[in-house]
C-alpha cells in the first residue's frame, strides 16, 4: 500500500522540476522543450505501474493526507484521493499531453517564446491533475482556477491578434460566471457541514439543499461550455492548435464534467438536479451539433464536436451513469486530440488556411494525416470497434433502457446522427475531389515530430476503447435480453447521418447558394447567440446607462436641482438689490467713446 501511494505521488511530483527549472535558471537553452517532453513521457511510464497495481488489486479508494493549516472552525489538509477516476485519468492525460508536446515541437518551432509555451502547457496539465486527485473542495478549487487562468494565457498566446485577446477574455469571463456557482457551493457546504471533504459531506448530508447542487451545475456549465455559457469554446480556436488539442482532450473542458462525476453521490437522489442536468446536456449536444453542420473553419467544426460530446457526457450523468460519462471522457481524449493535430497539420501545410472550402484532395499529399483524420472522425461518430464506439454505444443503449424522458432521448439521438453528418462533410470537403488551394503550396509530411504523435494517437483511437472498457466497473446489472432494435439504435442513426450527408454532398457540391435559408443562417451564425449576448445586450445596456446619466445627472441634478438653480436665484436677487448690472463691456465702451471723440476734435 505504501509503495503504491508513493509511486502515485511520485507521478505527480515528477512534473514539478521542469517548472522550477525556469525559476532557478532563467537563461534557458533550446533543449528545454525536449526536456519537458521527455519528462512527461517518463512520467507516463511511471504512472502505468500504480494504475496497473490499482486495477489488479481491486482497490476502491486510497486517500493520503498531510496536515496543512487549521482555523477555529475548519482544518485544511493536502489530501489526495486515488480512486478509479483519478488513477485511470492520470496516464491517459499524460499520454495525450506527451503526444501534444511532441507535436508542438513541430508546430511552434519558429515561435521565439517556445520555452515559455511549453512551461504553460506543463502547468496547465499539472493543475488539471491537481483537480483530478483533490480530496477536498479547497484543493479542487486551486486546480479549478489553475486550469482557468492557464487557458486564458494560452488562448491569448498570440496577443498581437485582436481576435486572440477577445477570445481569451471571453473564456475567463464565462468561467467567472461558473465560478460564482462553485464559490456558492463552497460557502454552503462550509456553513452546513463544516467540511470540504466529499466523504464527510456525503455522510453528514446525503441529500443536500438545491442551492449548492445548482451551484455545482452552474460551475460545470461554465467550465464545460454547456448551453448559455458555451460561446467561449469555439472562440478559443484563436489560440495555437496544440492549445486547442490539450484544452479539448484532457484538461479544461472535461473539468466541469469531472466535477459532476466526483459529486454524483450528492446529486443522484435529487430528481430536480438530475432532470436539469439531463435537459441541459441534451439541448447542448443538439444545438452545438446543428452549429457544426454549416461551419467552414476546420478547427471550429472540431470544437463544436467537442461541445456536443460534452453535452452527451452531461446527459450520461443525468441518467445516473457517472462511470459511463468518465469512460467517454477517456475515449474522447484520444481521437479529439488527434483530430486537432490533424487539423493543425493541414493548416500548417496550407499556409494557415482553415477554410475547408479551400482544401480538397489532401489524401494524396498528406496520406497519414488524411488516414488519421478519417479514423478520428469515425471514432467520433461511434463506428463499431473504434475507441468512440465502446463508450458512445453504451451511452445510447443505457439511455434507451433508462427511465428518461422521451424528449431528451430523441434530442440525443438526433445529435448523434448529426455528428456523423458534419464529420462526413468535413472529410469529403477536406480530403476528396480536386485540390482547391494554390498548386505551388509546399506540402511536407516527413517530419518525425509531426508523424510520431499522430501515429500514437491513431493507435489509441483504434485500441484504447477496448482496453479501457475491460477495466471499468459494472455500470448496471447484467441484462439477460435486449431488443435488437435497441441494440442497433446507435449504429442505425450513425449510418443514417453518414448516408444523408454523403447524398447531400453529391447533390449540392456543384451548386452555389445565392440566398442562404434562414435555417442555414441560424446554424452558421451559432443561433445568433453571440450577436445577441455580445452586441445587442451590451449596446442596450450602454445606451440605457448613457440616457440615465444624461437625464439624471446632467438634466435633473445640474440643470433643475442644484448648481444652475442656485445660480439663477442668486442672480435674480443680485439684480433686485443692486443698481449695478455688472456690464463691464458696456462700461468700457462708454468710457472709450467720449475719449475717442475728444481725440478726434483735438486732431
From Swiss-Prot:
Pfam families cross-referenced by the UniProt entry: NADH5_C, Proton_antipo_M, Proton_antipo_N
Family, per entry: Belongs to the complex I subunit 5 family.
Query: Is the keyword Transmembrane assigned to this protein?
Result: yes
Location(s) in or outside the cell: Mitochondrion inner membrane
| Catalytic reactions on record | a ubiquinone + NADH + 5 H(+)(in) = a ubiquinol + NAD(+) + 4 H(+)(out)
* Presence of keyword Zinc: no
User: What does this gene product do?
Assistant: Core subunit of the mitochondrial membrane respiratory chain NADH dehydrogenase (Complex I) which catalyzes electron transfer from NADH through the respiratory chain, using ubiquinone as an electron acceptor. Essential for the catalytic activity and assembly of complex I.
Q: Which GO terms describe its biological process?
A: electron transport coupled proton transport; mitochondrial electron transport, NADH to ubiquinone; mitochondrial respiratory chain complex I assembly
* Protein name, UniProt field: NADH-ubiquinone oxidoreductase chain 5
What GO cellular component is one of the record's annotations?
Answer: mitochondrial inner membrane
| Membrane topology category | Multi-pass membrane protein
Name the gene.
Answer: MT-ND5
Coiled-coil regions listed in the entry = none
What is the source species? Hylobates lar
Q: What broad class describes the main subcellular location of this protein?
A: mitochondrion
A GO MF annotation of the entry reads: NADH dehydrogenase (ubiquinone) activity
Its keywords, alphabetically, are:
Electron transport, Membrane, Mitochondrion, Mitochondrion inner membrane, NAD, Respiratory chain, Translocase, Transmembrane, Transmembrane helix, Transport, Ubiquinone
What Enzyme Commission number(s) does the record list for this chain?
Answer: 7.1.1.2
| Assembly information from the UniProt record | Core subunit of respiratory chain NADH dehydrogenase (Complex I) which is composed of 45 different subunits.
Cystine crosslinks: none
**Transmembrane spans:** 4-24, 36-56, 87-107, 114-134, 137-157, 171-191, 200-220, 241-261, 272-292, 301-320, 325-347, 366-386, 407-429, 457-477, 482-502, 583-603
Amino acid at each position: 500500500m505504501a509503495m503504491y501511494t508513493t509511486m502515485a505521488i511520485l507521478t505527480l511530483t515528477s512534473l514539478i522540476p521542469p517548472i522550477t527549472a525556469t525559476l532557478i535558471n532563467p537563461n534557458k537553452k533550446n533543449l528545454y522543450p525536449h526536456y519537458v517532453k521527455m519528462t512527461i513521457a517518463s512520467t507516463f511510464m511511471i504512472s502505468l505501474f500504480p494504475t496497473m497495481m490499482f486495477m489488479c488489486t481491486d482497490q476502491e479508494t486510497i486517500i493520503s493526507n498531510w496536515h496543512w493549516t487549521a482555523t477555529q472552525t475548519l482544518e485544511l489538509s493536502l489530501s489526495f484521493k486515488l480512486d478509479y477516476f483519478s488513477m485511470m485519468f492520470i496516464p491517459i492525460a499524460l499520454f495525450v499531453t506527451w503526444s501534444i508536446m511532441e507535436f508542438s515541437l513541430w508546430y511552434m518551432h519558429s515561435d521565439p517564446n517556445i520555452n515559455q509555451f511549453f512551461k504553460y502547457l506543463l502547468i496547465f496539465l499539472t493543475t488539471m491533475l491537481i483537480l483530478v486527485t483533490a480530496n477536498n473542495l479547497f484543493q479542487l478549487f486551486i486546480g479549478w482556477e489553475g486550469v482557468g487562468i492557464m487557458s486564458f494565457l494560452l488562448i491569448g498566446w498570440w496577443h498581437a491578434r485582436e481576435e486572440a485577446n477577445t477570445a481569451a477574455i471571453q473564456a475567463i469571463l464565462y468561467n467567472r460566471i461558473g465560478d460564482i456557482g462553485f464559490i456558492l457551493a463552497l460557502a454552503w457546504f462550509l456553513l452546513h457541514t463544516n467540511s470540504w471533504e466529499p466523504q464527510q459531506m456525503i455522510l453528514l448530508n446525503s441529500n443536500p439543499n438545491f442551492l449548492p447542487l445548482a451551484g455545482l451545475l452552474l460551475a460545470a456549465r461554465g467550465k464545460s461550455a454547456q448551453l448559455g455559457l458555451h460561446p467561449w469554446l469555439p472562440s478559443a480556436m484563436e489560440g495555437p492548435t496544440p492549445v486547442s488539442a490539450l484544452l479539448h482532450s484532457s484538461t479544461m473542458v472535461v473539468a466541469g464534467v469531472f466535477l459532476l462525476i466526483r459529486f454524483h453521490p450528492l446529486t443522484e437522489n435529487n430528481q430536480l438536479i438530475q432532470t436539469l442536468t439531463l435537459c441541459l446536456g441534451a439541448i447542448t449536444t443538439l444545438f452545438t451539433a446543428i452549429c457544426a453542420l454549416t461551419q467552414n473553419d476546420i478547427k471550429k467544426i472540431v470544437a463544436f464536436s467537442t461541445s456536443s460530446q460534452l453535452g452527451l457526457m452531461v446527459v450520461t450523468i443525468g441518467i445516473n451513469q457517472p462511470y459511463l460519462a468518465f469512460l467517454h471522457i477517456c475515449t474522447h481524449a484520444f481521437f479529439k486530440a488527434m483530430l486537432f493535430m490533424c487539423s493543425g497539420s493541414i493548416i500548417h501545410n496550407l499556409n494557415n488556411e482553415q477554410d475547408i472550402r479551400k482544401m480538397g484532395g489532401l489524401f494524396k499529399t498528406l496520406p497519414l494525416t488524411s488516414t488519421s483524420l478519417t479514423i478520428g472522425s469515425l471514432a467520433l461518430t461511434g463506428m463499431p470497434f473504434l475507441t468512440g464506439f465502446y463508450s458512445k454505444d453504451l451511452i445510447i443503449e443505457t439511455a434507451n433502457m433508462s427511465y428518461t424522458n422521451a424528449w431528451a432521448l430523441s434530442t440525443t439521438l438526433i445529435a448523434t446522427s448529426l455528428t456523423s453528418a458534419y464529420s462526413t462533410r468535413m472529410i469529403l470537403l477536406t480530403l476528396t475531389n480536386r485540390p482547391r488551394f494554390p498548386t505551388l503550396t509546399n506540402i511536407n509530411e516527413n517530419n518525425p515530430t509531426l508523424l510520431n504523435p499522430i501515429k500514437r494517437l491513431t493507435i489509441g483511437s483504434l485500441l484504447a476503447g477496448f482496453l479501457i472498457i475491460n477495466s471499468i466497473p459494472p455500470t448496471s446489472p447484467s441484462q439477460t435480453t435486449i431488443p435488437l432494435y435497441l441494440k442497433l439504435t446507435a449504429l442505425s442513426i450513425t449510418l443514417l447521418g453518414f448516408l444523408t450527408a454523403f447524398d447531400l454532398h453529391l447533390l449540392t457540391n456543384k451548386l452555389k447558394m445565392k440566398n442562404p435559408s434562414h435555417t442555414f443562417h441560424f446554424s452558421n451564425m451559432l443561433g445568433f447567440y453571440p450577436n445577441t449576448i455580445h452586441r445587442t445586450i451590451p449596446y442596450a445596456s450602454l445606451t440605457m446607462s448613457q440616457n440615465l446619466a444624461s437625464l439624471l445627472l446632467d438634466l435633473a441634478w445640474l440643470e433643475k436641482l442644484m448648481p444652475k438653480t442656485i445660480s439663477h436665484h442668486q442672480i435674480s436677487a443680485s439684480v433686485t438689490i443692486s443698481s449695478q448690472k455688472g456690464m463691464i463691456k458696456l462700461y468700457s465702451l462708454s468710457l472709450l467713446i467720449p475719449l475717442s471723440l475728444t481725440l478726434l476734435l483735438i486732431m
